[in-house]
A protein has these predicted regions:
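Extracellular glycan-modifying ectodomains
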Residues: 1-386
Length: 386
């Protein structure tokens, strides 16, 4: 007869555990009841929670977008947000965890998780985007508008020496180049900024932010200006710009906010970086006066013939001012924070600015991380798909 292994026997609770268990149960019950009450109040009384997404179809139901939308809406309920903030703070202070949306690399370098995701239908979604861009390029060409696609490489690609324990899959190595080749085969003008930014290394990006630094933005703007010149386009209206640099000052990073740590005292957050800001101003004078002709009754000559659509990259670190200085002309900025691949394009093509004063060159800035994410075709010209 084999001897019984006492190590497999259940551990009996201690007297302390027995005494505290009713209190723990009451605390847990109170917490759950409070959370339920807060959610019911938000749904039934406050009117601040929309249970259904704007567009409801079978794809949204099959892909779980409805439950995802509800969870996202309920996350903004005051009690839920406070509880989430406390959880994020405890995880960060105890074990250095930055949450599901942010990864921590070397020495307080933060990276966006979206850059590292392997999407289930990556190839199909990337191809759908390429087909869309090619179709739009053809439509724009018929209107006399030239399209220049500008690919912004991932921070985790360019600042790879700062990844440390953060892993970037080999499957992502050729993501941008593969997409660029597909577009070029379709006759689309593409500028990949990776060769421009790679020599800068980690200096090209901000440490606690998803976006490029001013060094990276300025170098990228120069590359875009060089490509525009190669297209034989003369940017208008011609302007002159002067620049000055401020003393370094603290710059909050958006990755700290995405990690849910921006509400903590600064001393408990990931170390904030000090950034010198370039101030670029237009010089008023002879260039502007010479540009005004006698037949320019409505000031059309002062409207930019270059326009930019894209994401928050075009709205950060002075990219547009650097571009204006590099081309020597004003540039229309129609980029959209959080717009991802389609947001800015969709808004711009339906706007009076595009319909009434279309540009000669449209610069479409696209982050690499958006190339393979789930895609829904929602960009139209004149009410028709591109």
């Amino acid at each position: 007869m084999s001897k019984k292994d006492n190590s497999l026997a259940p551990v009996m609770p201690s007297r302390m555990m027995i005494r505290l268990s009713p209190l723990a149960g009451v605390v847990m019950f109170t917490f759950l009841l409070t959370g339920l009450a807060a959610c019911l109040w938000a749904i039934l009384v406050s009117g601040k929670v929309d249970l259904l997404p704007e567009k409801l179809d079978w794809d949204a139901i099959r892909n779980g977008e409805i439950t995802h939308h509800i969870a996202k809406e309920l996350a903004h309920v005051p009690f839920a947000k406070s509880a989430a903030d406390l959880e994020r703070a405890a995880s960060w202070l105890a074990i250095g965890d930055t949450g599901p949306r942010v990864r921590q690399g070397c020495a307080n370098w933060l990276f966006l998780t979206d850059e590292l995701k392997i999407h289930p239908h990556a190839a199909a979604d990337a191809d759908a985007r390429a087909q869309k861009v090619a179709a739009l390029q053809e439509q724009l060409s018929k209107r006399g508008i030239r399209l220049l696609v500008v690919l912004v490489p991932d921070k985790s690609r360019i600042a790879s020496q700062q990844l440390c324990a953060v892993e970037r899959s080999p499957l992502l190595a050729s993501r941008a180049q593969d997409w660029q080749r597909v577009l070029q085969a379709k006759g689309v003008e593409v500028l990949d900024l990776a060769p421009t930014l790679q020599p800068l290394g980690s200096d090209a990006f901000l440490r606690t932010d998803t976006h490029w630094s001013e060094v990276g933005a300025e170098r990228s703007a120069a590359a875009v200006a060089e490509r525009i010149a190669a297209l034989g386009v003369s940017p208008t209206p011609a302007k002159q710009f002067v620049a000055s640099v401020t003393a370094p000052q603290p710059r909050p990073g958006d990755l700290v906010r995405l990690a849910g740590l921006d509400w903590l005292p600064e001393s408990l957050q990931p170390a904030m970086e000090q950034v010198a800001v370039t101030q670029i101003k237009e010089v008023q004078g002879a260039v502007e006066e010479a540009a005004l002709g006698e037949d320019d009754l409505f000031g059309d000559s002062q409207l930019p013939n270059l326009a930019v659509i894209g994401t928050s990259f075009s709205r950060n670190s002075n990219f547009i001012p650097f571009l204006e200085r590099a081309v020597g002309a004003r540039v229309g900025n129609f980029a959209k924070d959080g717009g991802e691949f389609s947001g800015a394009a969709k808004d711009y093509f339906s706007s009076p600015a595009f319909k009434q004063t279309p540009p000669e060159v449209l610069i479409w800035e696209i982050p690499e991380r958006d190339l393979q994410s789930p895609y829904r075709d929602d960009i139209m010209l004149d009410g028709q798909p591109g």
